[in-house]
Amino acid sequence: MVVTMRAALRLMLISTVSLELIIGILANVFIALVNIIDWIKRGKISAVDKIYMGLAISRTAFVLSVITGFLIAFLDPASLGIGIMIRLLTMSWTVTNHFSVWFATCLSIFYFLKITNFSNTVFLALKWKVKKVVSVTLVVSLIILFINVIVIHIYTDRFQVNMVQKCGANNTLRAYGLFLSISTVFTFIPFTASLTMFLLLIFSLWRHLKTMHHNATGSRDVSTVAHIKGLQTVVAFLLLYTVFAMSLFSQSLSIDAQHTNLLSHFLRCIGVAFPSGHSCALILGNNKLRQASLSVIFWLRCKYKHTENQGP
């Protein structure tokens, strides 16, 4: 009975992860397509749409790399002990996750600079050059990625030496745990940047509401609504990214347990929620994407009713 219950829970968790991955692919492909079609129609693309498109493309690549890793672990687990396979999987995961997270961080920075109002000279200079700020942020992130790749490369080489000296599944698990630990450390950099944007947005909103109160003006003006929308976008990223980072950290701590246990599947389940859930939150929070999604849903409903009417 206990075995049956464990098997049912395991199947449920695996099904949940699979559903999250499918939603992640669909949501991110949708975001990319909407922005590409709009770009073709208008002949130009805004800075924020570029960020959305870059985020969607990198997220799609990230989810595909996760799916590839899961399939290899399921179909040919022995290959995970091969050095070149470990290098390919870790590098693809690292690069795609890096751009996925940093594009989301750039989105937080963009909203912060566009929405908030501070009289500081440095802030005003950054506000007028928001595109350059985003570009510089991405360049800095490339330097961080380079360091991250070097660190992983060094430890992958050490792992290959250990594999020659003593083989076994424990070595593969330790290498995986070490990779997760390194990834967790590097995730705190963009997380800290987004958290800073979040706190400054709250401070800016508080100042704005205080000014509105002194002037005896309604609190639901354009600036207030913009602040709240910006906060919603950043909060969605922070909450889901916190869950993602905690998932990575927890997996690195529980790495001595077998990969087939329920805890491992549960941690993967909550970790995969980040690239899927955040993209869905972006669709709901962006007027253009939300309208496009409603149009698609309406079209699918009409298509379904038309098919039903033509049925036997």
Swiss-Prot record:
Regions crossing the membrane: 17-37, 66-86, 93-113, 134-154, 185-205, 230-250, 265-285
Keywords: G-protein coupled receptor, Glycoprotein, Membrane, Receptor, Sensory transduction, Taste, Transducer, Transmembrane, Transmembrane helix
Record bears the keyword Nucleus: no
Residue positions the entry lists as glycosylated: 170
Membrane topology, record value: Multi-pass membrane protein
Pfam families listed in its UniProt record: TAS2R
Entry similarity comment: Belongs to the G-protein coupled receptor T2R family.
Protein name according to UniProt: Taste receptor type 2 member 103
